[in-house]
A protein has these predicted regions:
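The AdoMet/dcAdoMet-binding core of the Class I SAM-like
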Residues: 84-85
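C-terminal partner/receptor-binding element of secreted or periplasmic proteins
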Residues: 74-81
Length: 85
């Protein structure tokens, strides 16, 4: 589930929309795709989302950075990358 949400966001740096606001997103992929780091920052605002994602033999593991998992999941479910991304 989380993997599918992350796959909808392009690797590298991109822009998109969440909750009517523009976000700058940086997504990096490591370990042959088994590890993903994502940082999103509201353009002109103070909101941000930060996470690490791991896919192991035991399944998916979401590790939010200094925030509740629900905030991260809400962002991933609602974020829409710009068409040019």
């Amino acid at each position: 589930m989380i993997r599918n949400l992350l796959n909808a966001i392009p690797a590298g740096t991109s822009r998109g929309q969440f909750d009517g606001k523009t976000y700058l997103v940086s997504k990096s992929i490591h370990n042959a795709g088994r590890s993903i780091k994502l940082f999103a920052e509201e353009a002109g605002g103070d909101d941000f989302v930060s996470l690490n994602f791991y896919e192991t033999s035991h399944g998916e593991s979401l590790k939010p950075c200094e925030m509740p998992a629900e905030k991260v999941l809400t962002f991933l479910r609602g974020y829409e990358p710009d068409a040019s991304a």
